[in-house]
Amino acid sequence: MLRSNLCRGSRILARLTTTPRTYTSAATAAAANRGHIIKTYFNRDSTTITFSMEESSKPVSVCFNNVFLRDASHSAKLVTTGELYHNEKLTAPQDIQISEDGKSLVVKWKDGGHHQFPLQFFIDYKGSSFVSPATRKQESRYRPQLWNKRILKDNVKDLLSVSYNEFIDPKDDSKLFQTLVNLQKFGIAFISGTPSSSSEGLTIQKICERIGPIRSTVHGEGTFDVNASQATSVNAHYANKDLPLHTDLPFLENVPGFQILQSLPATEGEDPNTRPMNYFVDAFYATRNVRESDFEAYEALQIVPVNYIYENGDKRYYQSKPLIEHHDINEDNTLLGNYEALIKCINYSPPYQAPFTFGIYDKPSDLNNNLDLNLITTPAKLTERFLFKSFIRGLNLFESHINDFNNQFRLQLPENCCVIFNNRRILHANSLTSSNQQWLKGCYFDSDTFKSKLKFLEEKFPHDK
């Protein structure tokens, strides 16, 4: 994609301040150590590299666009992609030299710029894999593990093994890494032993900022309270009745990726038995069940828009989203066994749902016998009813699954315990009533924050599984 000269400053700054990193698997790196560059030739438009990836493997050749090679370089002669497109001197090589050991080659351009490309670069970009290097940089090496109650309980020992002091220790990131890996795999993690003097939200703020900055929302600029004894219309959590399973803030275009809830100490005289029950469900597991049971209904869940609304005080938010959103399709994630690589996020929140505007019209069954009916619905809107019926069928399958006790992880969150969960994957609910005196403290942070910290720690702990 061509970028304008407006990006020149940021592009140059990035190259001056960023150390290039290689994002490769151990197997791929080992292949590079055993392979070598054999030959190369170039013209004004392209450069062809012939190399082997193993000592005894058959050599392969890849022809690269010269604009790509110059743009991917870290030459001291800094230019924008747009400049490369319009100036052949910046892209056509003047000379190319293969190193004596065959592990790299140096490209020299006509403007005096030069860059040494390691063999690993050409292996990464060889194009024989469905996963591009850019995708590999984004993806974690840990794949989501879809779960029901039994599967999660089998892993609960690891999920509950992180204490607050271990998590918050700035000299040791191992427990932070363990927590983020659990979030990546299961969408949920717990931290025990949080300090009891937390009414101001300082503890949960420290927990969040260990991962990244707190996300401001309609609930406040930092942390927020969840307490049924103080009902208010600001947050649907506060209603004095059990909430259905849902994701938070679906009426925002950029929905917060993760939520943290901390259980605070009991009030004086509180009966521990009245503490609310918390429910968690893996919505990805539920949507996979729909896909396997009724593919036509599953497709409708990807298409039919569900409307969400939030009106309170001076705030007016409105969004329309399908229940299911996918990642871009590739050769890998379309396989039935790799569904966890296909599903991106879930939009499901009955507390904030507005009336449908798609598929709401039907065709009168006796229209032919009532020709005088002045039916004003357009034919295009009438045809939506077929897809909407499939949507309702899929929604029924989805809700039957998430409301099945065997698919729910239920617990009374202990005092001074914290739960972190993926707000785009894990549905949650609680049984707060007017008799419950427990306070929950909450906050949000973004998915980008989580992904950034997880990738950094994966680099720091490359051998952890």
Swiss-Prot record:
<comment type="similarity">
    <text>Belongs to the gamma-BBH/TMLD family.</text>
</comment>
<dbReference type="GO" id="GO:0045329">
    <property type="term" value="P:carnitine biosynthetic process"/>
</dbReference>
<dbReference type="GO" id="GO:0005739">
    <property type="term" value="C:mitochondrion"/>
</dbReference>
<dbReference type="GO" id="GO:0046872">
    <property type="term" value="F:metal ion binding"/>
</dbReference>
<dbReference type="GO" id="GO:0007005">
    <property type="term" value="P:mitochondrion organization"/>
</dbReference>
<dbReference type="Pfam" id="PF02668">
    <property type="entry name" value="TauD"/>
</dbReference>
<feature type="binding site">
    <location>
        <position position="428"/>
    </location>
    <ligand>
        <name>Fe cation</name>
    </ligand>
</feature>
<dbReference type="InterPro" id="IPR003819">
    <property type="entry name" value="TauD/TfdA-like"/>
</dbReference>
<keyword id="KW-0496">Mitochondrion</keyword>
<feature type="binding site">
    <location>
        <position position="246"/>
    </location>
    <ligand>
        <name>Fe cation</name>
    </ligand>
</feature>
<keyword id="KW-0408">Iron</keyword>
<keyword id="KW-0223">Dioxygenase</keyword>
<feature type="binding site">
    <location>
        <position position="248"/>
    </location>
    <ligand>
        <name>Fe cation</name>
    </ligand>
</feature>
<dbReference type="GO" id="GO:0051213">
    <property type="term" value="F:dioxygenase activity"/>
</dbReference>
<keyword id="KW-0560">Oxidoreductase</keyword>
<keyword id="KW-0479">Metal-binding</keyword>
<feature type="transit peptide" description="Mitochondrion">
    <location>
        <begin position="1"/>
        <end position="16"/>
    </location>
</feature>
<protein>
    <recommendedName>
        <fullName>Probable oxidoreductase AIM17</fullName>
        <ecNumber>1.14.11.-</ecNumber>
    </recommendedName>
</protein>
<keyword id="KW-0809">Transit peptide</keyword>
<dbReference type="InterPro" id="IPR050411">
    <property type="entry name" value="AlphaKG_dependent_hydroxylases"/>
</dbReference>
<dbReference type="InterPro" id="IPR042098">
    <property type="entry name" value="TauD-like_sf"/>
</dbReference>
